[in-house]
A protein has these predicted regions:
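N-terminal export/assembly segments and adjacent metallocofactor-ligating motifs
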Residues: 1-225, 233-234, 241, 247, ...
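N-terminal leader/propeptide and maturation segments of large enzyme subunits in energy/redox metabolism
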Residues: 55-62, 223-261, 338-351, 356-360, ...
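Flexible, glycine/charged-enriched surface loops at secondary-structure junctions
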Residues: 83-87, 226-231, 278, 309-316, ...
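Extended redox/cofactor-interaction regions of prokaryotic respiratory oxidoreductases
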Residues: 102-173, 180-187, 210-214, 302-425, ...
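Flexible glycine/proline-enriched surface loops and loop-helix/loop-strand junctions
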Residues: 154, 197-198, 247-251, 280-285, ...
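Long, contiguous, secondary-structure-rich segments that constitute the structural scaffold
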Residues: 459, 465-525, 592-608, 612-735
């Protein structure tokens, strides 16, 4: 993206025609992003100065950066002294730049001495990470965007790319236009816009992907469609998996998944016998209590057929945020260390300790996202530091999340937007820079690293996230409990490039080796990793030689069982509730929600239901319904949709407490879609099951309705709306 500006004001954006990821194309969100930077908007939304309050019932008062960090570090030092370093938790974001991520990872795991740092990428990508590592040996997507145009079969699972990855979806449309024989298979409970373009749509029941993939592999085995030579030469463990999948007959797949046997056979045939099959998959696989098994079972299909390590083929996980990949590279998850090292590996811990000038880094596993907030809700974690993410909207089971935010003794929110829901729970607000103001790097789904450059100076007193991390480290170093380690560690980086250089050196000899890549080279063009010292360019696709980063050099088949969803539907809660993206909104809408034209596609929240369910509940479009789970209840308009099967319900994930009111079962106010989602997570990846919750749906007969409209000055409208939202929570439905 190219940002246009006049002085300190962003005035426009356009796609970069030379960038190999998008070739100048922008989605609706990207093309309108500059509108969220208009002065009349930012005056109402941006956090511009540090703010502090003594009690959460008090109003915030402006303070200086020095005093703000003194307040924070004094409390952190006190808590660590009394309760140990694991009483502190940091929750960061896939929208940080790689350099920001690196500093906070080093700060928390090195200086503070806890592995309690996790990222909202846990909500979107950790199952993909675990699946790749379980089967291929490393968290490294083996394919690239170019492979879309080279494939003979595209298998799209758990991804509505038309909405979630619209520029990539344009590539799919172009590939089909250039090669009408290209077969497109979409496995998704909903008939999305992506599924509507498919040659074959597999409308499986939520959570049954492992059974589907096992059933496809059984069909391949029975018909001789597996690549025995590839299996023999480049893999291990196939016999154990083969025994598992032989029980997954077409009849059983039909029973569990709801897929007709003919569709199963067709999908298996196209996948296996095509010259090159590329899988594209996203949150439908990842956001599951079986997320790791889903990912690994799909990778198994590629290994069994040899559709990996060649043009147009491979299992290609699509990332959910701009720099989810960069966070994985620096070890920004609670179970990882820098450069794809494993926290559980003592050799890896020693390598990172040497890099950071320490005797050791802590070995105790850190709390992952859901675990961290559960620990805070139980009083185990006393301090929560939240950067560039909005857990008071985006985390599942908001009852638990809000209890955590209320019980923590100190909540620091490092944020660019004062309108984010989590700000209301903070003791200390720290203003951070946002897009257009930041310098550093990001990595996309195809391992391509891109330089990010600032177009305008920081707004107000906002600081870069990496600077906040360094200043925090320097303030902590004044306390005796941190001083010995601080004297051994380097937190004196003068710019993002200095951080990048240390991160780059940490990758030497690793699967993502970027020792051959510098800021100077990134000024010329983005590059894919690995790009080791001496290389002139990065690597397009991985494993072309059939050698994998495992102890044996072979990829692994794992005998995984199909396990149903964590919360099965039953008579009291008969509907399967699913969440996902809208085309024109982004995450919690702190930016896109300020742009009026982006509400043109979907103007208000609704729960989508099958026509049969609408009829049985005596509902018409727009009628209000209670959607209730074991955690709480919300009220929303019902909308008929033929995209869903009976007894399924869908709502967009973006609608927070500013749009949807709700209550928990003790009648305490909750809000947003995640008032009813479950915090159950995959035991391997710890990623929560946001794609299914058991709910009941009942018509809401409210006593009165009011529709009010007003024309408001543009420089006041958002502020007035924000004030109104604090009152909307008192009504059963207000939007």
């Amino acid at each position: 993206m190219i940002i246009e500006s006049e002085g300190a004001q962003i005035t426009g954006v356009r796609g970069d025609p030379m960038h190999p990821a998008n070739f100048g194309k922008l989605c609706s969100k990207g093309a309108t992003l500059h509108l969220s930077a208009k002065d009349e908007v930012t005056q109402q939304t941006r956090l511009l100065k540090p703010q502090f309050r003594q009690a959460r019932t008090d109003a915030f008062s402006e303070t200086t950066w020095d005093l703000a960090l003194q307040q924070a570090t004094s409390k952190i030092a006190q808590v660590v002294t009394q309760h140990g370093p694991d009483s502190v938790g940091f929750y960061v974001s896939g929208q940080l730049l790689t350099e920001d991520y690196y500093v906070f990872n080093k700060l928390v795991k090195g200086l503070i001495g806890t592995n309690n740092i996790d990222t909202n990428s846990r909500l979107c990508m950790s199952s993909a990470v675990a699946g790749y590592k379980m089967t291929l040996g490393a968290d490294a997507p083996p394919a690239c965007y170019e492979d879309i145009s080279l494939a003979d079969c595209l298998f799209i699972a758990g991804s509505n790319a038309a909405y979630a990855h619209p520029i990539l979806f344009r590539r799919i449309e172009d590939a089909k236009a250039q090669n009408p024989d290209l077969k497109i298979i979409v496995a998704d409970p909903r008939k999305t816009d992506t599924a509507s373009c498919a040659d074959l749509h597999l409308p499986l029941k939520p959570g049954t992907d492992v059974m589907l993939f096992h059933g496809m592999l059984r069909v391949m085995l029975m018909n001789g469609w597996v690549n025995n030579a590839y299996i023999e030469k480049h893999t291990e463990g196939f016999q154990a998996l083969q025994e598992k999948v032989m029980t997954c007959t077409p009849a059983k797949v039909h029973e569990i998944c709801g897929i007709p046997e003919t569709q199963l056979l067709q999908a298996a045939e196209w996948f296996a016998i095509s010259k090159a099959t590329l899988s594209l998959y996203c949150q439908g696989l990842n956001q599951s209590s079986s997320g790791t098994a889903k990912n690994a079972s799909l990778v198994h299909l590629h290994l069994a057929t040899g559709h990996i390590g060649k043009p147009g083929a491979g299992p290609f996980s699509l990332t959910g945020q701009p720099n989810a990949m960069g966070g994985r590279e620096v070890g920004g998850l609670a179970n990882l260390l820098s450069a794809h090292r494993d926290l559980a590996n003592p050799v890896h811990r020693k390598e990172v300790a040497n890099l950071w000038g320490l005797e050791e880094v802590p070995s105790k596993p850190g709390k992952t996202a859901v675990e961290m907030f559960q620990a805070a809700a139980e009083g185990e974690i006393k301090v929560l530091w939240i950067a560039c993410t909005n857990p008071a909207q985006s985390m599942p089971d908001q009852r638990m999340v809000r209890k955590a935010l209320e019980r923590a003794e100190l909540v620091v929110v490092q944020e660019a937007f004062a309108t984010a829901e989590t700000c209301a729970f903070a003791d200390l607000l720290l203003p951070a820079t946002t897009w257009g103001e930041k310098e550093g790097t990001v990595t996309n789904s195809e391992r391509r690293i891109t330089r990010v450059r600032a177009a305008v100076p920081p707004s107000g007193l906002a600081q870069h996230d990496w600077q906040i991390g360094l200043n925090l480290a320097n303030h902590l170093s004044k306390y005796d409990i941190f001083k010995p380690l601080a004297q051994r560690m380097n937190f004196s980086y003068s710019n993002p490039e200095a951080i990048w250089n240390e991160h780059r050196e940490s990758t030497r000899g690793r699967d993502l080796d970027i020792t051959g890549l510098s800021y100077a080279q990134l000024e010329l063009q983005p590059e894919q990793w690995p790009m080791s010292e001496g290389a002139s360019t990065g690597v397009k696709r991985l494993y072309e030689n059939g050698i994998f980063p495992t102890s044996s050099g072979k990829a692994k088949f794992v005998g995984l069982e199909y396990v149903p969803v964590s919360e099965p539907c039953e008579s009291r809660f008969p509907f399967s509730f699913n969440t996902g993206r809208m085309r024109d909104q982004w995450h919690g809408m702190t930016r896109t929600g300020t742009i009026a034209k982006l509400f043109g596609h979907v103007p208000e929240p609704s729960v989508q239901l099958h026509p049969q369910d609408m009829q049985s509940l005596n509902l018409s479009n727009g009628d209000l319904v209670h959607v209730t789970s074991k955690r709480g209840s919300i009220v929303a308009p019902a909308q008929v949709s033929d995209e869903l099967a009976p007894q399924q319900a869908f709502m967009a994930m973006h609608w927070g407490s500013g749009f949807i009111s709700g209550r928990d079962h003790q009648n305490r106010a909750l809000g947003g879609v995640n008032a009813i989602t479950t915090s159950a997570f995959c035991p391997s990846s710890k990623q929560p099951e946001l794609k299914h919750a058991a709910v009941k749906i009942l018509k809401a007969d409210l006593s009165w309705k009011l529709l009010a409209m007003a024309w408001l000055p543009a420089n006041q409208a958002l502020q007035i709306l924000q004030a109104l939202r604090s009152r909307m929570t008192h009504f059963e439905f207000a939007s």
